[in-house]
């Protein structure tokens, strides 16, 4: 697939003549049959969504997605967004410039009906781009997904929108949900999915209550309690016994802060209220607040060791010339088998000519499991049981769950340097 395909980059129109003709027809239809969901409150790009649709390009047999979001009162061109679309493997006859058919919600294509929900706008978080790139790689490279019917809805990374999306997915009669990588959205949605008997696969929602309270939730990453326990053990190994802990206002940050404080008590370390009295500072939260906190502390003249948490393990955290030994990030690790990591990296390099970012491996691993479920696997009503009791053999390693937690999930400590993040060896 070419790098400019709208399935992997937002805002680019189709370039081949047939696709462009089909897309123009798709734009004119602006049909609610595509399944878009209006937002009641101001959202990531505004209140009103128009021009939602999907087309399939027959020259590469890949999905092409396009949606347009427009804020009320905002001047200038509308911002291209993937907001809420239904995609099926039907050929839209794009190559010849023929009519592009809109697929209704009730698809005639057999196979799993899979809801995909996350924060899709890379301007709000770079993790959105990573998640969509994992979907693009899977659609191009993972066998078993051809019979899947997809339904995309943006959850805004917040609880209210997450619940709205869940209700819409249930009405759409989804068999399975993937995504909701924000803990805020995942928790509110998981309860509704549980009532409907729908499994939720999430690549990056770490909050403990997601799996403790919802047996239908399965995560492909460490939990807050594992991140917190591994972090505190690492702090103790460095003889940093007095710890100042802060968090942003997200559900993820607040829950991880609580887990860290509980782990400090179990380990016999001391939480101090003032950073001046601490050996080390810890900040739990999303990427943007973490980056801002790091910059603010250094600009304030603090040279005290600072540890950020999983969401900050991203190239978008930034580089630093003199932060080795001063700034760290605890995030998701990979198994010791180098072949597993190389496989994911090679697929990403093939399409995007770059190394994958945070959450890519977890997202791709989730999609490999989805492919096994979709490719002649259990019926929709048996998915929960299959996820609870099956070991899935994937190119990234074996996958199985213990009460919703990924067996063998690992963490890693990183430090920012002149060229970005590098692992800490001890």
Q: What spans do the regions from the language model cover?
A:
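Hydrophobic alpha-helical membrane-insertion segments
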Residues: 12, 25-26, 38-42
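Extracytosolic ligand-binding ectodomains
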Residues: 1, 7, 17-23, 29-33, ...
């Amino acid at each position: 697939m070419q790098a400019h395909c709208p399935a992997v980059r937002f805002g680019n129109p189709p370039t081949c003549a047939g696709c462009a003709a089909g897309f123009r027809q798709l734009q004119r239809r602006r049909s609610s049959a595509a399944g878009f969901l209006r937002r009641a409150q101001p959202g990531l790009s505004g209140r009103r969504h128009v021009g939602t649709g999907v087309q399939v390009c027959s020259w590469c047999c890949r999905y092409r997605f396009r949606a347009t979001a427009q804020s009320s009162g905002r001047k200038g061109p509308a911002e291209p967004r993937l907001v809420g679309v239904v995609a099926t493997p039907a050929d839209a006859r794009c190559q010849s410039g023929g009519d592009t058919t809109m697929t209704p919600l009730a698809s005639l294509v057999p196979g799993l009906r899979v809801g995909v929900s996350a924060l899709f706008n890379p301007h709000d978080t770079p993790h959105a781009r990573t998640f969509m790139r994992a979907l693009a790689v899977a659609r191009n490279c993972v066998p078993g997904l051809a019979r899947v019917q997809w339904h995309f809805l943006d959850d805004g990374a917040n609880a209210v929108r997450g619940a709205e999306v869940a209700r819409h997915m249930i009405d759409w009669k989804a068999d399975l949900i993937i995504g909701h990588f924000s803990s805020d959205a995942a928790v509110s949605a998981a309860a509704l999915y549980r009532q409907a008997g729908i499994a939720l696969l999430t690549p990056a929602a770490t909050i403990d209550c997601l799996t403790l309270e919802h047996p239908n939730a399965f995560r492909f990453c460490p939990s807050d309690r594992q991140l917190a326990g591994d972090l505190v053990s690492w702090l103790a190994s460095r003889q940093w016994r007095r710890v100042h802990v802060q968090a942003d206002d997200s559900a993820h940050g607040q829950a991880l802060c609580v887990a860290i404080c509980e782990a400090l008590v179990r380990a016999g370390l001391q939480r101090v209220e003032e950073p001046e009295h601490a050996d080390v500072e810890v900040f739990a939260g999303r990427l943007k607040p973490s980056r801002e906190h790091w910059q603010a502390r250094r600009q304030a003249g603090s040279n005290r060791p600072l540890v950020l948490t999983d969401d900050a393990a991203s190239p978008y955290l930034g580089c630093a010339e003199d932060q080795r030994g001063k700034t760290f990030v605890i995030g998701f690790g990979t198994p010791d088998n180098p072949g597993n990591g190389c496989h994911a990296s090679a697929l990403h390099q093939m399409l995007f000519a770059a190394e994958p970012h945070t959450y890519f491996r977890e997202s791709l691993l989730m999609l490999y499991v989805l492919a096994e479920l979709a490719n002649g696997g259990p019926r929709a009503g048996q998915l929960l049981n299959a996820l609870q009791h099956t070991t899935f053999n994937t190119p990234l390693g074996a996958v199985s769950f213990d009460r919703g937690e990924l067996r063998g999930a690992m963490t890693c400590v990183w430090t920012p340097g002149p060229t970005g993040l590098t692992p800490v060896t001890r």
